[in-house]
Amino acid sequence: MGEDGRVFLRGLTSEAYGLDELRRRQRGAPRVIRAGTVTDDASVGHSGDSDRSRTWWMLGPGDEPFRTQTLQVHFVELSPGGSNKGHGHQNEALFYILEGKGYEIHDGKRYEWERDDLVIVHNDSVHRHYNLDPERRALALVMKPKSAWMYLGLIQQGRGFGADEAAYGPPEDWARLWTKGLDQRKKVVKPADTRWEDTRDGRIRVLTSPERTDVRANAVDIYQQDVAPGSRSVKHWHMADEAVYVMRGRGHSLQWDVEAQIGERYEARVAKEPSRWTFEPGDLVYVPQNTVHQLVNDGSEPLMVLVAQNRLFKLIGYDSVVYLEDAPAAGREVVGTARA
């Protein structure tokens, strides 16, 4: 949250062409955001909450210290039998249901959901969330690339009619601008629509990815990972940053920063020693752009995490993953990679 209101998109200014100092400050921010942290309580510059709903942010462009604006991560809580006000925005948003059961109304259509479903609020959607349980709350973790839409000027959002009747013609179908066939794709991804795979990355369940063309998600790639006690994930390197939500278990994230050596061409210099970031259930682990990293389960129970990336990195030429150390196969046949 900024001093003058909600920060939708953060600016970048410098008197120098090299931005090393900005990068140093960004990477100096803690890379684990503790459970219960509220960086934005949705009291300024928001429109969706009612007296039966609550929204709060863990990761956003207005955070101090600043980490990223490629992804925003927040929670939506609905009281028993409650709903929010509903609103419309141009950016997509993906809701992972942590608790409860309920339904959505998106553009007049109803979509039911329950725990462990992934709900996609598509581009240019007027939507509202409802809790069907009269006794228990519903809770969703929301991952969205809102600032990317803001950068592209896609800022038409809110509620109600905003055009001057005298100056504008009759309503026309906005969906004519969408990619053909998008409205036929899944809006709710259920566990039965996915499968667990043993891959180079470890035990993975992909929810959204460029290859999942049956799902109506265009900008956020999400997978779930299960790491056995005493084991670890893959050690790998990619350009996209990541937000990793710890659903259960505890452990630490090893992160090797990567510096650019810019001579005749770009070359990478990887830190000889990693930084170590411990985490517990409900924490959010942040992995900065261009970082080698690995998760280690040093607890006594399985580690379950939900990992999100902004797909834009893949679309602008950074769709490769460099594998430096495969995850242990734990006696299972490894079938390939299931990276989101």
Question: What spans do the regions from the language model cover?
Answer:
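A short, N-terminal "cap"/entry segment at the start of jelly-roll beta-barrel domains
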Residues: 1-69, 155-219, 234, 323-326, ...
